[in-house]
Amino acid sequence: MLTQQLAASRSEDDGRISDMSFHDETLNNEDLSKIIFHNVQFSKCRFTRCDFSQSRFLSVAVKNCDFSNCNFSESFWKQVTITDSRGNGADFSQSCCKELTLCDSSFAYANFSKSQWENSGVSNCSFKESFWAEVRLKKLTLAASVFSGADFFKTPLKDLDFSDCKIDGITVSETFKELRGMQINL
């Protein structure tokens, strides 16, 4: 069903998929770039090496999906919830995330470099060995998440509360300036 909707949105030249639910879909190496997903729900879907670059996700719910190793570079996310899902190795570089909620999900080895986050929340997620270089974070709440081995080079962590998060082995600059003003438990 999703491939048909994708073809229809491309042929109509508006690149929009709205007010739909997709369940148990499997896509491999598909081009979903520059598509606008509005008021869409994905559940138990699997995307393998799909290209979502420059796509927009507006009022979207993602539950129990796997989008590992997909390309979401330069994508835009607003009022999106991702729950019980996997995005291991996915590329979210240069993305903009506003009111994004991530729960009970894994993003190990994912690339968030040069992305922007605002009014978003992360709860019980794994970001092991992920890349957060040169990221702008504004009003991000963190709870019970794992950032072991993550790279925060040139990403100010001021005002972020990592108190109940695991942050062993993270990478920052030689001056440790990224760590100024962050909260942790010792």
Show which residues each predicted segment covers.
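Tandem repeat scaffolds
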Residues: M1-L186
